[in-house]
A protein has these predicted regions:
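Low-complexity, Ser/Thr/Pro/Gly-enriched N-terminal "stalk/linker" regions
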Residues: 1-68, 93-113
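C-terminal beta-rich recognition modules with glycine/proline-rich loops and embedded aromatic residues
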Residues: 5, 11, 280, 346-354, ...
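Well-ordered alpha-helical scaffold segments within catalytic/enzyme domains
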Residues: 13, 73-86, 135-150, 183-195, ...
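Carbohydrate-binding/catalytic loop surfaces
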Residues: 42-61, 110-129, 180-192, 219-253, ...
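Extended ligand-binding groove/face enriched in aromatic
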Residues: 50-64, 70, 79-177, 184-240
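Catalytic cores of eukaryotic secretory-pathway lumenal/extracellular enzymes that build
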Residues: 104, 139, 143, 157-164, ...
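Beta-strand-rich binding/interaction modules
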Residues: 463-486
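Short, surface-exposed beta-strand/beta-hairpin micro-motifs centered on an aromatic residue
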Residues: 506-508
Length: 641
């Protein structure tokens, strides 16, 4: 889907995109250039200048520091489509010139090894992220070419891709990435250029993984140095314990996993590979049905930033990395290429309205790496086992993978909204926009996620009959569909000429369309009480609240600085009040006032007297907005009466 043909015009996401283009991208540019006071030093641009011989100094930062620049450039490419900016484009061009100058004569591109350890190139695939950085720069190169028509970075990365292909593969040196990502980059290079060698190399890296589970241990034995001190025998950490066709459970580092799954699904759809798609489907089902938080977060433990056991989803120790949630959206969209099943669009929606945008402060200048479902100041971020659960968003990180990843996700949102084949236009998300598609131009007007009304105005480009398929969120028990004001019935209920059919989470309306035909979908936005599977021991006796796609959280600032002693009364949910915030940092959001009781006990540590129950009204805010009003308790899963 060409982003130039999609213009987001949505009250919710339009604001998010404006925040990213006007605030976040300039802020991150300053950080990458070490011009932003009070945040972690980046040095990422300076590393490229040093590698290019344009500056003197030493490498600084993580071994994968180059990827911060790549993801920022990719986000810039998308932002130039949303909001052309000649000055920003010139600065991006200048950075690309520096990157090109840092490339070595053999095509190799990596500032860490060029500056610091040139003699160690390609000796430590386990730890050193050379292929990972290459993959992100490939994605940036394709995005920038598609946005601007400029191919300088694309040519640089074609040189790096050629270098990689010459080195790794059958009858060459064996090798797999220690952190998957180059597979995604190679597939994007293939889609942009049509060069079959890129697709072939992506398949090699995917299918080589797990063939020799001892690969990284054997690699480590050949060298007398390490970088992080990773344990090469921890083969589940990087999913090298089995081939991609043998893996049935989502294990290991969650971002590594979903990046690999994304490339697998892309390759499966591109080559109509049913065996590979079946492998993707097994992993998808395990991950989303047994290892995903209600907010969409995946990877529940700080140990290895990884998946753990099925149903092991602690709230106050959750990891749920922002990058992992973004990666799940990448995976979902690739799965939709091959199977138009609403469960993939449901997952995208869950992530987009919850576990992704919770990673960014509402002012666009502070970011979460970790997205917990419960926070307790004094414990969270302070004591052993909880130090990763930072109760307030920092400005930047030494390992700053998430902020630029969030930028490229929000600015490329249009890529995830549509698909189109010979007979059907598919709408996956209720996002207001203007879309110029092959068969029709469609204007979507949406009040989502706060109100249940979406309209599609269709201007066909052909007199042929075709279908418009619109995803209906899986939580909806009922909805109404009209065409030009006339209510449509499902095909099983009517003999009318125009009707809708429902299949796998989508309604299909087949018609010979006319200018200004309007489909409208209306539905109630009820507060829903959600209960976890009883195998999720952390959530037994608790419930969460959801309205539309938005998961809600309770913060101390709204609830006498104590959410832990609250119990919500789900039997009185019909008394709940829905309020749209009129001012302040939460302006425009729908807040919930819920009947509840507060438990009040004595000062004794233990007592035979039960706590007193005091009736109160508890306020809940959208989960993604938590942490914007100072240091607070926060909780998603609440005890119930």
């Amino acid at each position: 889907m060409d982003l130039k043909n999609i213009k987001i015009e949505d009250p919710f996401w339009g604001h998010m995109q404006e925040l990213v283009t006007d605030v976040v991208i300039p802020f991150q540019e300053d950080v990458l250039n070490d011009r932003q006071p009070g945040v972690e030093k980046s040095h990422a641009i300076e590393n490229f200048k040093i590698a290019a011989g344009l500056s003197q100094g030493e490498f600084y930062g993580m071994v994968f520091q180059d990827s911060d620049v790549a993801k920022w450039l990719e986000g810039v490419a998308y932002s130039l489509i949303i909001k052309p900016d000649a000055a920003l484009e010139k600065r991006a061009d200048d950075i690309i010139d520096i990157i090109a100058a840092a490339q070595q004569p053999d095509g190799y591109l990596n500032t860490y090894f060029t500056i610091k350890e040139p003699e160690h190139r390609w000796q430590n695939l386990l730890e050193c992220h050379e292929l990972y950085c290459a993959g992100h720069m490939m994605e940036a190169a394709v995005a920038y070419y598609e946005a601007t028509g400029k191919d300088k970075l694309l040519k640089v990365m074609e040189g790096m891709a050629g270098h990689i292909i010459d080195r790794f593969g059958p009858d060459k040196l064996p090798g797999i990435p220690g952190h998957q990502e180059v597979e995604i980059g190679l597939m994007r290079m293939y889609h942009a250029t049509g060069n079959e060698a890129y697709k072939k190399q992506a398949r090699y890296f995917l299918e080589e993984r797990g063939k020799n589970p001892a690969f990284f241990a054997e690699e480590a034995a050949k060298r007398d140095w390490n970088h992080f001190g990773m344990v090469p025998k921890d083969i589940k950490y990087n999913q090298s314990h089995a081939t991609i066709y043998e893996q049935e459970e989502a294990v290991g580092h969650s971002v590594r996993a979903v990046y690999m799954y994304t490339a697998m699904a892309d390759l499966a759809a591109t080559e109509h590979d049913e065996k590979l798609f079946a492998a993707c489907e097994r992993l998808w089902n395990n991950m989303t049905e047994k290892k995903m938080y209600i907010t969409g977060g995946i990877g529940s433990t700080v140990e290895g930033e990884a998946f753990t056991k099925e149903y092991e989803l602690p709230n106050d120790m959750a990891y749920a990395e922002t990058c992992a949630s973004i990666g799940l959206v990448f995976f979902a969209k690739q799965m939709l290429k091959m199977s138009k099943n609403g469960k993939y669009a449901d997952a995208m929606e869950r992530e987009l309205y919850n576990g992704i945008i919770s990673g960014m402060q509402l002012d666009g200048k502070r970011f979460f790496y970790v997205n917990p479902l419960e926070v307790n100041p004094g414990v969270s971020g302070e004591i052993f086992g909880y130090k990763h659960v930072i109760p307030e968003r920092p400005g930047w990180y030494a390992c700053a993978c998430c902020p630029p990843n969030l930028v490229r996700m929000v600015t490329s949102l249009g890529r995830y909204a549509w698909d189109e084949d010979d007979d059907v236009i598919y709408s996956h998300l209720f996002i207001g926009q203007e879309a110029r598609l092959k068969k029709a131009d469609i204007k979507v007007v949406s009040e989502y996620p706060w109100k249940g009304h979406v309209s599609y105005s269709i201007t066909p480009k052909t007199g042929d009959e075709f279908a418009v398929a619109i995803h209906i969120p899986g939580y909806l028990k009922s909805f109404e569909v009209t065409l030009n004001g006339m209510r449509l019935k499902e095909n099983s209920e009517t003999k009318a000429d125009v009707f809708y059919s429902y299949r796998d989470g989508y309604i299909y309306i087949k018609n010979k369309w006319h200018d200004n035909d309007v489909i409208e979908i209306s539905f109630n936005m009820d507060i829903r009480v959600i209960y976890a599977n009883t195998k999720v021991r952390e959530d037994i006796g608790c419930a969460a609240l959801q309205r539309g796609p938005v998961v809600y959280a309770f913060e101390g600032v709204d609830n006498d600085d104590d959410v832990q002693s609250l119990m919500i009364d789900v039997s009185r949910l019909n008394e709940a009040q829905i309020e749209t915030e009129a001012e302040g940092i939460l302006k425009g959001a729908v807040l919930l006032d819920i009947p509840a009781v507060r438990l009040e006990g004595s000062d004794a540590l233990y007592s035979e007297k039960p706590p007193r129950q005091k009736s109160v009204i508890a306020r809940a805010i959208p989960y993604y907005m938590w942490g914007n009003r100072g240091l607070n308790q926060m909780r998603v899963w609440m005890h119930t009466i």
